[in-house]
Amino acid sequence: MQPFLRALQSLGALLVLFAGMTGAARALDLSQAVILVASSSLAGSIYEQTVILAAPLPQGGHVGFIVNRPTSVKLETLFPEQAAARNVAAPVYVGGPVLSRAVFAVMRKAPDNSADFVSLMPGLVAAVDGSTVDRVIEKSPNDARYFVGLMLWAPDELDDEIRNGAWEVRPADADTVLRANPSGLWKSLEGEIV
């Protein structure tokens, strides 16, 4: 019976190892948008307990938005001249430290199917220039989540951060990105097995 138990334990260990390798290989497939969940190695940093949508850029690298950092600032504070901004009850989010004075809008689809939007993934687009954000505010202000700043990675930089254990990688989906109440989002995703 002992040899059988040892063989069974070895098989179990191999299955666990194989599952870990499969997860690691999948985690490093960054050719599609992913959700990044801050690992415990980021404790004490500005990225502690962050959840980020990261999407590949055509020329390499990635762009992203922190999706669980709402501010106390309302859109009307940033756009007092736009009456439609007063109707947006949701707060503006901190999207990241890059271009921290710029406002971006992320939504499920571009209003009027405009080409002035960047596709982040199927079902999510971003308005990244001021005139396009203005149009979103005027035409469909409550259909977007607004971010101040964004995340930006050079080619291979995000791969390196993941390999060094900074981020856990999850499949991206629009519902996670646009979740109405992001408090508790990190906790619900951290350590989740995918």
Where are these regions (language model features)?
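A short aromatic-anchored loop/beta-hairpin motif
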Residues: 26-194
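Bacterial N-terminal signal peptides
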Residues: 8-21
